[in-house]
């Protein structure tokens, strides 16, 4: 069996979207929602060939008749049966490959429970019979994708946000901070704010509409109070959005009030620090000698860092917290939505990485716990 001609598969399972493709490619082939939908009603049409579950885009398009569930919450897999369906869909329907013929690189949120990666390992080897696999930390991959080995990554997706300081390619576990505030919470908050305005969004299907509003119209204000004043005195910030039924809604200060919750979690009734303080606290937990390198290499990654204005605001906030002479640079790569996947594609195609894979043989000898020894 010659390993050289077999491309590894890279699967970045996010709480919101699954990104999958082949190592060495510069972008994922498949990007679809991490959703499993089940019919809400018994089928009335005879011979319609109704399935008992739908995955990804198909679930999204039939959302009106389905109950949608996300098997990954806050970066942790909470429903393994549904997770298996998502992986099955990834390999067989999206990538159209046989997983038993390719090594698979999976990703995981930092500070996840140990059982989570053991179960991932077990399913890959026992259900999908992969020849080899590896579990990589998402934020580290984002840093690789930006061409750095030292820096601090603020990775904010749909389910969880982290600040991960990395020095010479190694994450510093004692300084990693986790914030359970991310895209899904912002969507829920926008649902609540719109409900206060008299628009009702309640079902799982309607939540997806609100997510679309958030992605298309929200932005981060450089100065929140100023922006609120502007919004109150003029209609210059108002934008309209057409709902699927043709009704048009107008949103004003909600556009920046929604992402502001990342900087002020008290908006959501959370006691946590905002992303700017979390980043600062994370840097302060590191050795005093490397802080300068972290301030100068602060990399944003993940879908929830895609809001316009977020980099300038981070720059302003971190400058206010850091020592006044410190050089601060916020790096926001345009492809940051997929930078975890891109980093995985880079890593899995490095010749030096090939001895890092966990092989089927090693798994058979040691069991699922091998993952803690081979993957950090």
Curated annotation (Swiss-Prot):
Any one GO MF term held by the record is: ATP binding
Where does the record say this protein resides? Cytoplasm, Cytoskeleton
A Pfam match is Actin
Q: Which PANTHER family match?
A: ACTIN
Instruction: Name it.
Output: Actin-11
User: What job does this protein perform?
Assistant: Actins are highly conserved proteins that are involved in various types of cell motility and are ubiquitously expressed in all eukaryotic cells.
- Residues that the record marks as modified (N-acetylglutamate) are 3
SMART domains in alphabetical order = ACTIN
